[in-house]
Amino acid sequence: MNQEAFSTADAQGYFSRMLRGETPPAPVLTLLGSRIDAVDAAAGSLSARYEAQANFRNPAGTVQGGMLSAMLDDLTASLVDATLAAGQAVATLSLNVSFLRPAQVGTLQGEARMLRRGRDVCHVSGTLLQNGKEVATAVAVCKIVSVPS
């Protein structure tokens, strides 16, 4: 798929196609080293891994908070995406991030949990862990939108 021509119509079913390996991940997911480990849409949970690269470091030598925020945005929106019907897509309305400790270059484990799923608005929590310790948490409010066919 030509990424420059990616449209909202392409979003329909994108998550499912990506999990099945039928379409490559979006460039931002490649940048973040995103890999979905497990999804349980019925239980409202998702596990993923991210690879923080050396070029994600801030002047202090730890992973820059904006990169962690991008990981949490992907994590929470992916859980909502896993629950969508045909003709729907997800858009993040807000993302409230708390940074708990510095993250180092390397693997981060992500865990997302659906707090509330309404007809068109979802509240989702996300946590990033490194070496079993919480690095950052977030609560996202996501909007379910109709995708023009």
Question: In which residue ranges do the predicted regions lie?
Answer:
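Terminal targeting signals and extreme-terminal segments of soluble enzymes
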Residues: 1-149
